[in-house]
C-alpha cells in the first residue's frame, strides 16, 4: 500500500470515530442522536460537493476521480437511514406471491450463493459488504467463511458488532480496503460475490480485474450488478435524468450500461457462465414495490412496518421527522439533505424500474479459467 493510500485510510478511520462515536451499537434513526454535529455537516458536504446537477463529461470525470472519498462519505451519512428502512441487507430482490420481505431478501442471497457454487469450507470474498447482512446469511446458509471488503469504517464497525452478537465472529470477518486496489495476495479466494456494490467503482474493468486477480484459478465470481439496460439511451434527456437521480441518491459516480459490464468481465479474462437480468420478468410484485407506496403489493402483515418506512408516504413522514429533529438539534445539520438525496434515488429507481431502463439485479456468474496464472 502506498504512503498516500495509508494516509487516506488513517484519516477516514479517525473521521469515522469522531463522527459516529458510540452510535455503532444503535441502529436506524436512533443512531443519529449519537453523531458529532460538526463532523456530520462535513461528511454531508464532502458527499454533495460533486452533485450540482451537472451531467457533462467534466462533472462525471470529477466524480469518477473522487470515487473513494465520495463513496466513503456517502455511506457515512446514509447507513443509518438504510438500516432504518431496509435492515442489514442493502439490496433489492424479486418478490414471489405470499412471500415476506425478509424471506425474499434471504432467498435472493441464497440464490446468488447457489449459482456461485459456494459450499462449506470455501473462503469467500464479499466485495462491498455493507454492514454484513448478506455475508452473515450466506455464511449460515452454506457453512463457508466470508471476508467482507468495505472502504467505510462505520459499516465495518457495525458489521463486526452484528457478527459478534450473532456468534459469527469466527466465520465472518471484515477488512478495510479499496476494491480497485485490494490488499489480498493473488489467488486467495475460492469464490467471490458482490451484491449491488461494484456499481460504485469508477470502472467495471478495474474492479473486475482485481476480483479476477484475487480469485483462485477455476474459482467463480457472481454478482448482482446495477446497470442501465439495453433500452437506455445516453442522449435522451429523460433517460439521463433518471440515471442522474440514481447516481445522486445512491453515491454512484457513473451509471454504466449492461454492455460495459459484460465487456469488462470478458476483457479481464472471465468466462461468463450466466448472463441474466433477474428484474426482466412478469412477476406480479415488482422489485421496486417497497418504494412505490402501492399498498396492493404488500404480501404479509410482517411487511407493514417495512412498507411504512420505505414507501413514498413513509419517506415523507421520515423527512418531516428528521427535519424536526434537526430543528430541535436532536439530529445533526445536514440530515435533511441526506433524506432529500435518498428521495431522488427512490424517484430514479422507480422510474428506471417501471420503464425497464435500469436493473439492480443483472446477474453475472463468471469463472476464472483453470489455466489462468
UniProtKB/Swiss-Prot annotation:
Uppermost EC category: transferase
EC numbers on record: 2.1.1.41
Example of a GO MF term: sterol 24-C-methyltransferase activity
Keywords linked to the UniProt accession: Lipid biosynthesis, Lipid metabolism, Methyltransferase, S-adenosyl-L-methionine, Steroid biosynthesis, Steroid metabolism, Sterol biosynthesis, Sterol metabolism, Transferase
Matches recorded under InterPro entries: Erg6_SMT_methyltransf, Methyltransf_11, MeTrfase_SMT, SAM-dependent_MTases_sf, Sterol_MeTrfase_C
Reactions accelerated catalytically: zymosterol + S-adenosyl-L-methionine = fecosterol + S-adenosyl-L-homocysteine + H(+)
GO biological process, one term: methylation
SUPFAM superfamilies: S-adenosyl-L-methionine-dependent methyltransferases
GO cellular component, one term: lipid droplet
Record Gene3D superfamilies: Vaccinia Virus protein VP39
Similarity remark: Belongs to the class I-like SAM-binding methyltransferase superfamily. Erg6/SMT family.
Name by which UniProt lists this protein: Sterol 24-C-methyltransferase
Species per Swiss-Prot/TrEMBL record: Eremothecium gossypii (strain ATCC 10895 / CBS 109.51 / FGSC 9923 / NRRL Y-1056)
Amino acid at each position: 500500500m502506498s504512503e498516500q493510500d495509508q494516509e487516506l485510510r488513517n484519516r477516514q478511520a479517525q473521521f469515522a470515530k469522531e463522527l459516529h462515536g458510540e452510535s455503532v451499537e444503535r441502529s436506524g434513526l436512533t443512531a443519529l442522536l449519537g453523531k458529532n454535529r460538526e463532523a456530520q455537516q462535513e461528511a454531508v458536504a464532502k458527499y454533495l460537493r460533486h452533485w450540482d446537477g451537472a451531467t457533462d463529461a467534466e462533472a462525471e470525470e470529477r466524480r469518477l476521480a473522487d470515487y473513494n472519498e465520495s463513496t466513503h462519505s456517502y455511506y457515512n451519512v446514509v447507513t443509518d437511514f438504510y438500516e432504518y428502512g431496509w435492515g442489514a441487507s442493502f439490496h433489492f430482490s424479486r418478490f414471489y406471491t405470499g412471500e415476506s420481505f425478509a424471506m425474499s431478501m434471504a432467498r435472493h442471497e441464497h440464490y446468488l450463493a447457489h449459482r456461485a457454487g459456494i459450499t462449506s469450507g470455501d473462503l469467500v470474498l464479499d466485495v462491498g459488504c455493507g454492514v454484513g447482512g448478506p455475508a452473515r446469511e450466506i455464511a449460515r446458509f452454506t457453512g463457508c467463511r466470508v471476508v467482507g471488503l468495505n472502504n467505510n469504517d462505520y459499516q465495518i464497525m457495525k458489521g463486526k458488532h452484528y457478527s459478534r452478537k450473532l456468534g459469527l465472529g469466527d466465520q465472518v470477518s471484515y477488512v478495510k480496503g479499496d476494491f480497485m486496489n485490494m490488499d489480498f495476495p493473488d489467488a486467495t479466494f475460492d469464490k467471490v460475490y458482490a451484491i449491488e456494490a461494484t456499481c460504485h467503482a469508477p470502472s467495471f474493468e478495474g474492479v473486475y480485474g482485481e476480483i479476477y486477480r484475487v480469485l483462485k484459478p477455476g474459482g467463480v465470481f457472481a454478482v448482482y450488478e446495477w446497470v442501465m439496460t439495453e433500452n437506455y439511451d445516453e442522449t435522451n434527456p429523460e433517460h439521463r435524468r433518471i440515471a442522474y437521480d440514481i447516481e445522486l441518491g445512491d453515491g454512484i459516480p457513473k451509471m454504466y450500461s449492461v454492455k460495459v459490464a459484460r465487456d469488462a468481465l470478458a476483457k479481464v479474462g472471465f468466462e461468463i457462465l450466466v448472463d441474466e437480468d433477474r428484474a426482466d420478468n412478469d412477476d406480479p410484485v415488482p422489485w421496486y414495490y417497497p418504494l412505490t407506496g402501492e399498498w396492493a403489493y404488500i404480501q404479509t402483515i410482517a411487511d407493514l412496518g417495512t412498507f411504512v418506512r420505505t414507501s413514498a408516504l413513509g419517506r415523507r413522514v421520515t423527512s418531516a421527522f428528521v427535519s424536526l429533529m434537526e430543528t430541535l438539534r436532536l439530529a445533526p445539520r445536514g440530515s435533511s439533505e441526506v433524506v432529500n438525496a435518498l428521495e431522488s434515488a427512490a424517484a430514479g429507481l422507480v422510474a428506471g424500474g417501471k420503464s425497464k431502463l435500469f436493473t439492480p439485479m443483472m446477474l453475472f456468474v463468471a469463472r476464472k479459467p483453470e489455466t489462468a496464472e
